Amino acid sequence: MLKVIEVLAESDKSWEDAASHAVTQAAKSVHGIKSIYIKDMEAKVENNKIIKYRINANISFLLD
């Protein structure tokens, strides 16, 4: 059986890095992560440059 949690993460490098950060942080409190589904992506802009890449994602993991 799998459980799904919704997470928000950000990075100053890329959306890929934000997704990796989301999985790394989630793995500190849940085990058996199987997948991440990116629901939404957003970028914060200042002075015409992207300064933050943000994601809203679902992470699926096995229940013990």
Residue ranges and their predicted role:
Residues M1-V7, T24, Y37-E42, K49-I51:
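Amphipathic alpha-helical hairpins
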Residues L2-I33:
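Short, well-ordered alpha-helical segments
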Residues V30-K34, F61-D64:
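Glycine-rich loops and low-complexity Gly/Arg-rich segments
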Residues S35-I38, N56:
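ATP/adenylate-binding site constellation spanning eukaryotic-like Ser/Thr protein kinases
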Residues E42-D64:
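A cross-kingdom feature marking charged/low-complexity
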